């Protein structure tokens, strides 16, 4: 009570994080070696699966919320799994003829937890609701994995906000959008950035709203936009 609350979001319904974050928090403790030791233990696997099959108000159970059909391993590097990058856990499991929970654990163990993922659990209705909230900070939340496929938000977050939600859908004004991308998050974090004032850093970005176009997508995410 009494604490100022803000939040941030980016304009995609698909999220991205590390695949290891699918595990319940208590099974992530101790670092990579400890996690891999648990994943190599059949009893621990059963305990993890038992937790993941239940809704939780203690942690964000993405497996239960999204399902393995909507969880994709976006970066895979080992000989065993490298060719499956970009496929869903369910699809990979099908090709190995095994339960998707075991496929998840096998991937994490083989790749030593160095895997990024994509998942879809939001809706456009959710997006519009939060975009209109005055507490929203507009961000990219970019993760730069070593190889594999980035989330298109890395290259497309800000131009998509400006094209889809300012120019096309007119959810908010260009002034409000730029403020939520620059000065507002800077103020929340206490950084002297984001405004055109004497003595401030000259980090100025010029763009043509009518000419803005987003080229990054999930198949070809590493594409610059045009118009900036």
Model-found features: residue ranges?
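Flexible, glycine/threonine-enriched loop-and-boundary segments that flank and lead into catalytic domains
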Residues: 116-125, 187-195, 214-220
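C-terminal cap of metal-dependent C-N hydrolases
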Residues: 41, 129-135, 140-141, 205-228
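Short, well-structured alpha-helical segments that form the helix of a local strand-helix-strand
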Residues: 101-108, 174-182, 200
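A short structural micro-motif
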Residues: 110-114, 183-188
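Active-site neighborhoods of metal-dependent hydrolases
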Residues: 1-170
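Feature captures the catalytic cores and cofactor-binding loops of soluble hydro-lyases/lyases
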Residues: 159-171, 180, 209-220
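Divalent metal-coordination and catalytic microenvironments
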Residues: 8, 97, 141, 177, ...
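Histidine- and aromatic-rich ligand-binding microenvironments
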Residues: 193-196, 201-204, 208-210
